[in-house]
Design a protein with these regions (language model features):
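Short alpha-helical hairpin
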Residues: 2, 15-39, 58, 185-194
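Acidic, carboxylate-rich catalytic segments that either coordinate divalent cations
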Residues: 202-231
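A non-catalytic, amphipathic alpha-helix used as a structural packing/dimerization or gating element
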Residues: 46-57, 80, 203-210, 214
Length: 231
């Protein structure tokens, strides 16, 4: 199994600079409850519905990235990521159907504030910045989910038997997903080496950290659904 190099290159550096926020993201109570199988079903349903809307905007972000890259190999790599998301959507729809959520129902849902904040931030970075800025904004989701999936699969406290969320956990620790993440990190590093400038680290760190915080807020959105039901 190819394990992405989470601690290396520009990604590893930005991840370290965002260490406190990164930990709040990858070890969020939503993630911990996925691991234990104790997450409230309505919290997961809220997450799934909003994730469907999120993925549509994420595909648009990759389409924008293609237009900003310099070489055909780079453009092909970004296009492959976009196609992976577009091809993932029918699988996502099928998975949601198992939870009693239809695609028309998801498509008709308004975007939650957390979804709006996150997706529009990434798209704004893409429109106002260059390919490197946009790649950095995309990485907390792309690589973060792999780190979460692998971490949960390897953690002895994670419950996989009789856990309704086991297939979600396995999906993000799957070899196919990890290969895609490794390719995304390689593209990030290639673009960084083309534009390498220490003067940009502060700005790139701010983008990465902001996207990381928005990821944690996306988890919290799901947990808030359970709290709203109890209220």
């Amino acid at each position: 199994m190819i394990v992405p190099a989470f601690s290396q290159g520009l990604y590893g550096r930005l991840r370290q600079l965002a260490a406190a926020d990164w930990q709040r993201y990858v070890a969020h109570p939503f993630v911990q409850q996925l691991a234990s199988g104790t997450l409230a079903e309505n919290a997961f349903r809220r997450y799934l519905t909003q994730d469907y809307l999120f993925l549509i905007h994420f595909a648009r972000s990759y389409a924008l990235l293609v237009s900003k890259l310099r070489t055909l190999p780079e453009m092909r790599a970004a296009a492959a990521s976009m196609n992976a998301i577009l091809n993932e959507l029918p699988l996502h729809v099928g998975y949601c159907a198992q939870w009693g959520i239809s695609e028309p129902e998801m498509a008709a849902q308004p975007e939650a504030p957390e979804t709006l904040n996150y997706t529009r931030y990434v798209l704004d970075i893409g429109h106002s910045g260059d390919a490197l800025d946009l790649l950095v904004a995309l990485m907390p989701c792309v690589a973060g989910y792999a780190e979460i999936g692998l971490g949960l699969l390897q953690h002895p406290a994670t419950r996989l038997d009789d856990n309704p969320y086991a297939s979600w956990i396995r999906n993000y620790g799957d070899e196919g997903y990890l290969q895609g993440v490794s390719a995304a990190l390689a593209l990030l590093e290639t673009v960084w080496q083309q534009r390498r400038s220490e003067a940009r680290i502060t700005e790139l760190s701010e983008i990465f950290t902001t996207a990381t915080r928005l990821e944690a807020q996306f988890w919290q959105m799901g947990l808030n659904a359970a709290a709203e039901t109890r209220a």
